[in-house]
Every structure is written in structure tokens, then in C-alpha cells.
Amino acid sequence: MRFQVALLLLSVAVARALPPVYKRDADSGDSQNPPNQPSKQSSTPLPPESSNQVKTTRPTDGQGQKSDKKDQDKTTLAAVSSKAESGPPTAATDHSLGDSRRQPEKTDAELKETARPLSPVNPKLEKSDQSSTEDSGKPTGGNSGKPTGGDSGKPTGGDSDKPTEAGSNKATEDDSGKSTKVDLDKPTSKIFPDTETSKTDKVQPTEKGQKATLTSKTESGETLAGDSDFSLKPEKGDKSSEPTEDVETKEIEEGDTEPEEGSPLEEENEKVSGPSSSENQEGTLTDSMKNEKDDLYKDSSGNTSAESSHFFAYLVTAAVLVAVLYIAYHNKRKIIAFALEGKRSKVTRRPKASDYQRLNLKL
């Protein structure tokens, strides 16, 4: 609040100090431009996209809000100062024109900075903004520059906001209406086939039930001959089912009685199994003892067999030696003659022809 009050005081001081400058600008502007042009410029200081972007930046950027508040405060103070002073209307209009010209420049600079991160605006909102700006431009054109700076600044802020909100609301209502209409149309179209399918489903089980009864009856061996037969056959089927149920109950009763009779038998079996189990244990002990004895016998027999095998080996070798010695003893003369004959043959060798030739050469 203090900051706003200080801005108000500064704007009032500037407005009082600069009226002659605006008069000169007004004289030059009136000579160059007709009276309708400034009203159009003041009426449309912002393009439609800029108004939308300013709206989008207001909830997010605190700096944009402060700048907009400053501009609005300046315009309102200029309007109040122009009304308070009894000067000509041209000065007020020129002052409003100057403020309105400054506003687009500031807003354009701000929009260029904010337009980069922002996403594109919806086309429906752009159309509604254009229509609102055109509506705001019409009354200023008719008044030919008479409205003050406050009037020229208002359509940019409040009037442009209201139609856009109304247009957006209308668009949302139209969209919601269309969606509801489409949704209402769709379920109605879907409900009918569902009901038909449910009807067909209801009919099918009855048909299946009839077919099942027919097949069961045909399996029982009965012939189908008409409606009267259908009414009679269930009775026959009931009669045939009753004896089967009686037979099943009898079997169940017999099955129940059998375990009762079998219970004492089980006790006897347990009694018999008791001594038999003890006998089996004794039998296993005796078998183990027999197995141990057999192992001992096998060991002893193995040892004896090994000893006997060695004994037989010794006997065989001794017999062979005795036989050799016996033969050698009886044939000792022949053996000695054979051994000595070899020596004799070497000494008593007959001379050869080579030996005679050598003797002849020597002589």
C-alpha cells in the first residue's frame, strides 16, 4: 500500500508539471491526424494475443502484476488530474494518448519476454478476444477522442477480461452441451442391443433346457410322440429315478455297516500283528547271527583254500624238478658225450682246400 501511494503522488506531480508539453504535442497531432485515429489507437492498445498472454502471466508472474498496476494507477491519476484542472480537453486526450502509447510499448516489451516460455493460445479464445477488442473500439470511435485516459485504459483491463471470460464460458458450455448430447445419444443406441441380447440369452437357456430334457429322455430309450408324451415322460422319469435312489441309499447303508463290522477285525489284526512283529524282530536277529557265522566260515575257508593253493603250487614245482633230475641222471653219458663232442670237433677238424693252397704257396 505504501508503494502504491508513493506512485500515486509521483504520477500527480508529473501530471502537473507536464501539461504544456502535451499541449504542443496535441497541436502537432491534431494537424497531422484526424480526430478519429487517436480514438482507435487508444481503443486498441493491445492485440488479442497480448491480452490473453497478459492474463496467463498474471497468476504466475509477480512482476507483470506490479507493472500492470503501475500503468493503471498512472492512467487513473492522469484522468483525475485532467478533470480537476479546468484546462482544454485536448490536453487530457493528449495525456491519455501518451499514456496509451506508453502502455503498448511496455506491454509489448513484457510480452516479448513472456511469449517465449508460454504455450500457444487456443484459437477459440483468440476469436473471443478479437470480438471483445472490436466491441471496445466502437464506442471510442463514435465519441471522436472525447473519452479521457481513464476511459481509454479501462477497456484494455476490465472490459477485455469480461468478454473473454464470457466467451470461454460459452465455449465450455457449448462443448459440455455437445458432449452430453453425444453421450446421451450413444448410450441409447447401446442399450437396445443389450436388451435384445439379454432377451436372446433368456430364450437360449430355455431352449437349452428343453434340449437337455429331450436328450435325457431319448437316452433312457423312450420315444417322443407329442405334448401328451412330454407330460407323461417326466412321471416315468421320476419313477425310474426313485428306484435308483433306493439302490444308492442301500449301497450307502451297506458301506456304513461294513466299517462297523471291520472295526473288530482291525483290532484282531493289530493283535496278530503285535506277535508277528516281535517274531520278525527275533528272526532278523537270528538272520544277522547266521550271516556273521557264515562270514566267519567263509574267512576260514578262504584261508584254507589259499593255503591249499600254495601247497599245490609247491608240489607241482617239486615234481617237475624230480623229473628233470631223474632224466638227467639216466642220460648223463649222452649229455657228457654231447658236451665233449663239441670240443673234440673243434680240434679234430679236417683241412680244407684253402689250407692246402696256402701250404703250396709257402713251399
UniProtKB/Swiss-Prot annotation:
Protein purpose: May be involved in regulating membrane traffic to and from trans-Golgi network.
Span list, region Disordered: 23-302
Annotated protein name in UniProt: Trans-Golgi network integral membrane protein 2
Location in the cell: Cell membrane; Golgi apparatus, trans-Golgi network membrane
Residue positions with a glycan: 303
Pfam families listed in its UniProt record: KCT2
Bias (Gly residues) ranges: 139-156
Other facts noted in the record for this chain: Not found in strains BALB/c, C57BL/6 and DBA/2.
Record flagged with keyword Transmembrane: yes
GO-annotated cellular components: Golgi apparatus; plasma membrane; trans-Golgi network; trans-Golgi network transport vesicle
Tissue specificity comment: Widely expressed.
Transmembrane segments: 309-329
Ranges per topology, Extracellular: 18-308
Phosphoserine carried by residues: 42, 220, 277
Motif (Endocytosis signal): 356-359
Gene name of this polypeptide: Tgoln2
Keyword annotations of the record: Cell membrane, Glycoprotein, Golgi apparatus, Membrane, Phosphoprotein, Repeat, Signal, Transmembrane, Transmembrane helix
UniProt-annotated stretches for the region 7 X 8 AA tandem repeats: 133-188
Keyword field contains Ion transport: no
UniProt biased composition (Polar residues): 29-59, 274-288
Biased composition (Basic and acidic residues): 96-115, 171-188, 196-210, 230-252, 289-298
Superkingdom: Eukaryota
UniProt topology in membrane: Single-pass type I membrane protein
Bias type Acidic residues, positions: 253-269
